[in-house]
Curated annotation (Swiss-Prot):
Four species of SH have been detected in infected cell cytoplasm: a 7.5 kDa non-glycosylated form (SH0), a 13-15 kDa form that contains one or two N-linked carbohydrate side chains of the high-mannose type (SHg), a 21-30 kDa polylactosaminoglycan-modified form of the protein (SHp), and the isoform generated by alternative translational initiation. Of these different forms, SH0 is by far the most abundant protein detected during virus infection. Tyrosine phosphorylated. This is Small hydrophobic protein. It comes from the Viruses. It holds the Pfam family SHP. It comes from Human respiratory syncytial virus. Glycans are attached at N52.
Length: 64
């Protein structure tokens, strides 16, 4: 019976720290993934030639 009480006490002390560390690591990993995705999308928009032309062509048609 002493072993079960020790494990329950250890798990009750350990569980909040585990969930807090898990939440912090997931938030940090999500921020890293989102920043990498935004950097990739910005580079794709810079190298895409048709990205700027789609905004310029309707203005040219309206002016003429």
């Amino acid at each position: 019976m002493e072993n079960t009480s020790i494990t329950i006490e250890f798990s009750s002390k350990f569980w909040p720290y585990f969930t807090l560390i898990h939440m912090i690591t997931t938030i940090i990993s999500l921020l890293i993934i989102i920043s990498i995705m935004t950097a990739i999308l910005n580079k794709l928009c810079e190298y895409n030639v048709f990205h700027n032309k789609t905004f310029e062509l309707p203005r040219a048609r309206v002016n003429t």
